[in-house]
Amino acid sequence: MFRRIVTLLGHWREAKSAFSTLASLYGDKTGSMDALGGLSDEEMKAVCWWATEDIGYTVVEVGTLFGITARELALQVVGGRVIAIDNFSWNPFGLPPNIHEAFTRRILRGTKVELVNCSSEDWRKQVKGRIDMVFFDASHQYEDVKAECEWAKAAGIKIISGHDYGNPNPLFGVTRAVDEVFGKDNIEVVGMCWRVKR
């Protein structure tokens, strides 16, 4: 199973396209097949651009899944830090948390990503030091996203961003939470990635 997952992640774009095609064949209109995660090329380019507007940024990704976005950020962020947070409680393959974490650590091996096994809530309680940009892609529940956004706003983080803005999945509350905290007119959106720059 481990080899299958490695192969799948090695061909992530093709696999995601295949899953999307499968979903449409089965009439999936909820976006649930997109739960496999990952950013589109356009979204990845935007997130990396946001993270590299200045040299020496500390960038935190909350909800790293397998570390694909964090790995790309680590390649792009010059002179800064990239921290990836995940509690490994969910993945699309149903891997046990310890295997999920070990796999993610393997994906991130050789990068400057600091991987922290922690929930978003627990991490926010203990965070120390300057954070220039945060990218939220952990829980997509309204209450959780709203708490993350309010915390980041109060902490004075320069760039507050995340994924799944405008996602039609009825279980997701990202759009509502982000709009309430920041106001719809203050949000820049690329694909389903959003950002507020302060």
Regions found by a protein language model. Give the residues of each.
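Membrane-proximal basic amphipathic "stem/tether" segments
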Residues: 1-35, 196
